[in-house]
């Protein structure tokens, strides 16, 4: 999964959301496969910047130690698992772009022909189709924890994912973009799958692609199967029973803030019996790490030999040779287990024997973020009816 952390500004007092128009056709379900993008040149990853971006995405405070580590580049690495990146092809206007699907935001933004040649070099870019409509006076802007950002104009255009097309879908075309995004040649933008109330277009928020097309689907849901070091899938409109074991366990979603937020009933570390300490958190495919309350994080790393919270590296680190315990989240009586190897995120620098943890503090956010470290172990159903989330171990 590409490390491409996003930030969404939570807008209070949103005005009426503008809906796009789905193409009328028989109800259906379809699967869209992520594609592996071989990285010809080793890609550097600033580990504390990834962490900082995740905190900023939800309005959290980035600790000074994390800021310092991110700015100094003390933990910049090119880990082997990023030899490939896993993105999803989407046809926007007349161009196919490789986008990052993000259940933690509600914007569809893309590299566009409004950027300079140097900014768009190496990227597939959105060119408004002949039938596209520019929304005069409408703008969007995002800002990230490492100081990067993007902004631009808004168009209504055709967007196709798998077997479903939305006409007059809001497309946020980048006209200004920071160098951090320009350098990520494998990613052409983002498709948000949170609730439309979170959309950041001004002066009037727009509907997400999923909210536009869900009336076309057999069921108004999508299911996510992210994989550990392999391409995953997104199923729209149906549940694929072949992709999980046993039965799905559902948790109610509180979408009052626009997120897929749920409450877990407890957690456990390694072979220990899970406790009953509740954890409220957001299921977010656009965040790489698993961010938890300080007490939970400390409990986990207390059982990791040699682990410490490092000011130098901006988070919990440990010897790479250490065998990590699993982390279990209890959801409605179901134990969702993240294997220990998923939590060994990456060496802090090339060739280092110290590794950065995939579990880190949420820095007092007040809720947890169940990012890819967690999601790669589960088949997760995002059901807009309820709304609710369904969980089961991957097959």
UniProtKB/Swiss-Prot annotation:
<keyword id="KW-0964">Secreted</keyword>
<keyword id="KW-0865">Zymogen</keyword>
<dbReference type="GO" id="GO:0004190">
    <property type="term" value="F:aspartic-type endopeptidase activity"/>
</dbReference>
<feature type="signal peptide">
    <location>
        <begin position="1"/>
        <end position="20"/>
    </location>
</feature>
<dbReference type="InterPro" id="IPR033121">
    <property type="entry name" value="PEPTIDASE_A1"/>
</dbReference>
<feature type="active site">
    <location>
        <position position="102"/>
    </location>
</feature>
<feature type="disulfide bond">
    <location>
        <begin position="320"/>
        <end position="355"/>
    </location>
</feature>
<keyword id="KW-0645">Protease</keyword>
<dbReference type="InterPro" id="IPR034163">
    <property type="entry name" value="Aspergillopepsin-like_cat_dom"/>
</dbReference>
<dbReference type="InterPro" id="IPR001969">
    <property type="entry name" value="Aspartic_peptidase_AS"/>
</dbReference>
<dbReference type="InterPro" id="IPR001461">
    <property type="entry name" value="Aspartic_peptidase_A1"/>
</dbReference>
<comment type="similarity">
    <text>Belongs to the peptidase A1 family.</text>
</comment>
<feature type="domain" description="Peptidase A1">
    <location>
        <begin position="86"/>
        <end position="392"/>
    </location>
</feature>
<comment type="function">
    <text>Secreted aspartic endopeptidase that allows assimilation of proteinaceous substrates. The scissile peptide bond is attacked by a nucleophilic water molecule activated by two aspartic residues in the active site. Shows a broad primary substrate specificity. Favors hydrophobic residues at the P1 and P1' positions, but also accepts a lysine residue in the P1 position, leading to the activation of trypsinogen and chymotrypsinogen A.</text>
</comment>
<feature type="active site">
    <location>
        <position position="284"/>
    </location>
</feature>
<dbReference type="InterPro" id="IPR021109">
    <property type="entry name" value="Peptidase_aspartic_dom_sf"/>
</dbReference>
<dbReference type="GO" id="GO:0006508">
    <property type="term" value="P:proteolysis"/>
</dbReference>
<feature type="propeptide" description="Activation peptide">
    <location>
        <begin position="21"/>
        <end position="70"/>
    </location>
</feature>
<keyword id="KW-0378">Hydrolase</keyword>
<comment type="subunit">
    <text>Monomer.</text>
</comment>
<keyword id="KW-1015">Disulfide bond</keyword>
<dbReference type="Pfam" id="PF00026">
    <property type="entry name" value="Asp"/>
</dbReference>
<keyword id="KW-0732">Signal</keyword>
<protein>
    <recommendedName>
        <fullName>Aspergillopepsin-1</fullName>
        <ecNumber>3.4.23.18</ecNumber>
    </recommendedName>
</protein>
<keyword id="KW-0064">Aspartyl protease</keyword>
<dbReference type="GO" id="GO:0005576">
    <property type="term" value="C:extracellular region"/>
</dbReference>
């Amino acid at each position: 999964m590409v490390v491409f952390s996003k930030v969404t500004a939570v807008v209070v007092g949103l005005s009426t959301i503008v809906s796009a128009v789905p193409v009328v056709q028989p109800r259906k379900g379809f699967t869209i496969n992520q594609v592996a993008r071989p990285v010809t040149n080793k890609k550097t990853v600033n580990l504390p910047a990834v962490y900082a971006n995740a905190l900023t995405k939800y309005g959290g405070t980035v600790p000074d130690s994390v800021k310092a580590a991110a700015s100094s580049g003390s933990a910049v690495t090119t880990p082997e698992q990023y030899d490939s990146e896993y993105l999803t092809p989407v046809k926007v206007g007349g161009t196919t772009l490789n986008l990052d699907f993000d259940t933690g935001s509600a914007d569809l933004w893309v590299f566009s022909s409004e950027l300079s040649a140097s900014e768009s070099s190496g990227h597939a870019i959105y060119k408004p189709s002949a039938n596209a409509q520019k929304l005069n006076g409408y703008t969007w802007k995002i800002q990230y924890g490492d100081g990067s950002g993007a902004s631009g104009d808004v168009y209504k255009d055709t967007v196709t994912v798998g077997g479903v097309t939305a006409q007059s879908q809001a497309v946020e075309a980048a006209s200004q973009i920071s160098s951090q995004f320009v350098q990520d040649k494998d990613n052409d933008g983002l498709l948000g799958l949170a609730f439309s109330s979170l959309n950041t277009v001004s002066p009037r928020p727009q509907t997400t692609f999923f909210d536009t097309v869900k009336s076309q689907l057999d069921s108004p849901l999508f299911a996510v199967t992210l994989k550990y070091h392999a391409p995953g899938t997104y199923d729209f409109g149906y549940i694929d029973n072949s992709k999980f074991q046993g039965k799905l366990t559902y948790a109610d979603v509180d979408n009052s803030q626009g997120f897929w937020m749920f409450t877990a009933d407890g957690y456990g570390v390694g072979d220990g019996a899970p406790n009953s300490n509740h954890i409220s958190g957001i299921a977010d495919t656009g965040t790489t790490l698993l961010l938890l309350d300080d007490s939970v994080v400390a409990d986990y790393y207390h059982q990791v030999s040699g682990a410490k919270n490092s000011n130098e590296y901006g988070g919990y680190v440990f010897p790479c040779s250490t065998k990590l315990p699993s982390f279990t989240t209890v959801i409605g009586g179901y134990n969702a287990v993240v294997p220990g190897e998923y939590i060994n995120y990456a060496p802090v620098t090339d060739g280092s024997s110290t590794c950065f943890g995939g579990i880190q503090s949420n820095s007092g956010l007040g809720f947890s973020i169940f990012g890819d470290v967690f999601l790669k172990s589960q088949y997760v159903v995002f059901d807009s009816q309820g709304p609710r989330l369904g969980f089961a171990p991957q097959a």
